[in-house]
Amino acid sequence: MASSLHKHLLSAARHHLKETKRMSMMVALNLAAEILAVDCGLKPCFLYDYTTSGVQQICSYLKELQNLGLIVGHLHILNVEETILIINVTKAVSYLETLLHSQDLHLIDVSNYLSQPELVSSNQVPQIHAQLAELLGHIKPYQSGQPTSVSVGGIQSPEWNLCTMFGFLLQFPSTYWFDTQKGFENCLSFTPLRLFTVQANCSRIGHQSVQIYSFTVPECVYQATQVHLEDWSKSLKQAFNEQNYFTDLEIITNTAQVCCVY
């Protein structure tokens, strides 16, 4: 049964998605599992970075997964300056609305002029709320999409900090921000980082060790964000218990230091 499904998933990915070389079985299964994590509500969004496929190719692929009976909810494909995100609109809208009513966004300022990362000042919150409201205003109309359907939308050249907006859409517990008016570089080089990786087995398609989340928090602000990280982990575990696509959830923490972060 699993072997037959694996072949169907590989065939669907190779048929619909553009790639310079033939996609392997492992990559095809990882891709399908990441989309299933969005569909079942484990996370609100998936940033598509597997191939150079365009919106219509990805749309065709998602419809093929629906034909296979794997996707049961409505998914939205959002194209932001050629970056493609696959969104569970209901979950994303709920999370963005929560952020709009919060004064503590758990943002980490990594502007290049800082000697080390620090929590974002409260006087930046109104500007970030305005960008969140614009993003919410774009995706909320798609909330009425029918189950087992795919919608498509695009945003051209938004005056947003895309790093921050993508972090919100991906529901990272702590998201990076930097002052775009003073440049797009950051102060993360040689900064000790705590790397969080969330993985689980996708029993729905018989695939092991699927990465669901991966994000970093600078060690210098870890203590200040620890309570929120624990709350985020509890919320994730609750969402995990409410679905039946994935089993054996693991949250893994490591410490790393990189020479340069873009």
UniProtKB/Swiss-Prot annotation:
What Pfam families does its record include? DUF4504
Q: Which domain of life is it from?
A: Eukaryota
Disulfide bonds listed in the record: none
Which protein family is named in the record? Belongs to the UPF0739 family.
- How is this protein named in the record? UPF0739 protein C1orf74 homolog
Q: Which organism is it from?
A: Xenopus laevis
